[in-house]
Each structure stands twice: as C-alpha cells, then as structure tokens.
C-alpha cells in the first residue's frame, strides 16, 4: 500500500 493512499483513508502507515 502507498503511504499517501493510507493517509487519505485515515490510516497511518510508515513505509
């Protein structure tokens, strides 16, 4: 998953 996409969904994923 792309960090940018995760942030858009409201998820905080590093990497």
Curated annotation (Swiss-Prot):
Protein role: Forms part of the ribosomal stalk which helps the ribosome interact with GTP-bound translation factors.
Any single GO CC term annotated in Swiss-Prot or TrEMBL for this entry: ribonucleoprotein complex
Alphabetical UniProt keywords: Methylation, Ribonucleoprotein, Ribosomal protein, RNA-binding, rRNA-binding
Recorded family membership: Belongs to the universal ribosomal protein uL11 family.
Protein name listed in UniProt: Large ribosomal subunit protein uL11
Organism in which the protein naturally occurs: Kitasatospora aureofaciens
Gene for this chain: rplK
Quaternary structure and interacting proteins, as annotated: Part of the ribosomal stalk of the 50S ribosomal subunit. Interacts with L10 and the large rRNA to form the base of the stalk. L10 forms an elongated spine to which L12 dimers bind in a sequential fashion forming a multimeric L10(L12)X complex.
GO molecular function: rRNA binding
Post-translational modification comment from the UniProt entry: One or more lysine residues are methylated.
Keyword Ribonucleoprotein: yes
